[in-house]
Amino acid sequence: MSKFEKEQIAFPNDFRRNYISDQLHQKYDHKTNTELIHLNVKVSVAGRIMTRRIMGKSSFMTLRDGGGCIQLYFTIHDMKSQTMYFKVIKTWDIGDLIGVKGVLFKTRTGELSIHCKEMVLLTKSLRSLPDKFHGLRNIETKYRQRYLDLIVNEESMKTFKIRSLIISEIRRFMHQHHFIEVETPMMHHIPGGALARPFVTYHNKLNMNMYLRIAPELYLKKLIIGGFEKIFEINRNFRNESISPYHNPEFTMMEIYEAYVDYNNMIIFVQELFRTLTERILRKSVIEYGDYSLDFEKPFIKMSIKEAIMYYLPDIRTKNIDDILVVFDILKFFKVPSDNQWTLEKLHMVLFEEIVSKKIIQPTCITHYPIEVSPLARCSNDNAKIADRFELFIAGHEIGNGFSELNDPDDQRNRFLKQATEKMINNDIDQDESNMPYDKDYIVALEYGLPPTAGVGIGIDRLVMLLTNKHNIRDVILFPTLRSK
């Protein structure tokens, strides 16, 4: 590097470009070489050298910038001196960042290229890039050094550009439907809003433990109480739990709340959102995900947990799954652990989650979740043991969870107290830390009146996986959580 410092400013910052590569391709790809010569299009571009072909007194390079790639051509006669030409071909390497000025032309094969008249080294790459054609063979390096993955893997860059577009389109859709975007705290006094183990931190000034949020739900419903009627938030949640191809401890979630609707209205709204996203992002409503074709044009399938069990497990259709002993036997057959204290409704849910859910391919809303595992959801008018709740499953995985909100402060207080009691008497750490604590402040807020409301949470990372055909959540998170080296 000292050699370059002596010969020029080591890291110049005075080069300015007037195009990026995709703008040139969009504007001039259809032109013939004769037309380009007549137009005499002068361009300034900057980017990273991705390939080099040295051919004696003339050379080619591929330059990659934020818009894509474009070919560069230069000869010994284009340089200020022969010394400059040989300096370029001998000391400029793949990975270096350069700026060039020149005119557009087309090669004999019809490729749009820049005939370079001026070239300047902007930043020297002091480390060799991975082989562009083989990429990063070490998967951990791909995630740990994402910048390298983005440099050599155009598919990764495309994925994260699509992710950004998806979030932009979600916001556009929400604003078109008159929802207001809000922000709620990332650090909570108590962990609430979902059943999950939190990350704990400590506030030195306040001399107290705080918790990275596991869900923003209670704060968002306080805003509905305050008078907002249609709100959403896109932000991070943190759960101190497992890491898997579908789980990252830090993940992006969108939560939506609307007053004066119920969970059935929310199903229709989510269906419209997903159909709009597939059409605007992928220009089609039937998309490919692995070996599956997922149809977002049709209304979402809707079935209860019991209906899903009977549909996806045809071998047990002759069995009476309203008999709790029969369900225990079915779980035992599938080697699914169970507890003899569980209710029939919870046994159904466990059987569904462990065996049935992975069989659901087309967008399907599963309903009739037990109230005992839905502490913030309203009870069904038809069955007090069942919540007005749905979960959206696509390609074998949960993508969203929504329900009609519980707005009875006495009922909510009793549910909080019941879980707090279970927390005190339960010696299992995992279960202990996943029980929802008693949130006195939320009960006070409910006593001022929460209108009939429905809400839904949608996992943005899993949604991006669907729309980019990725099967590991780490492929759609720029810097996923990894073990320290």
From Swiss-Prot:
Q: Name one GO cellular component term.
A: cytosol
Intracellular or extracellular location(s): Cytoplasm
Q: Which Pfam families match?
A: tRNA-synt_2, tRNA_anti-codon
In this chain, Mg(2+) 2 is annotated as bound at: 398
**Which superkingdom is the protein from?**
Bacteria
* Gene3D superfamilies named among the record's database cross-references: Bira Bifunctional Protein, Domain 2, Nucleic acid-binding proteins
Q: Which reaction does it catalyse?
A: tRNA(Lys) + L-lysine + ATP = L-lysyl-tRNA(Lys) + AMP + diphosphate
Quaternary structure annotation from Swiss-Prot or TrEMBL: Homodimer.
Identify this protein by name.
Answer: Lysine--tRNA ligase
Q: Which organism is it from?
A: Blochmanniella floridana
Q: What is the lineage of its organism?
A: Bacteria, Pseudomonadati, Pseudomonadota, Gammaproteobacteria, Enterobacterales
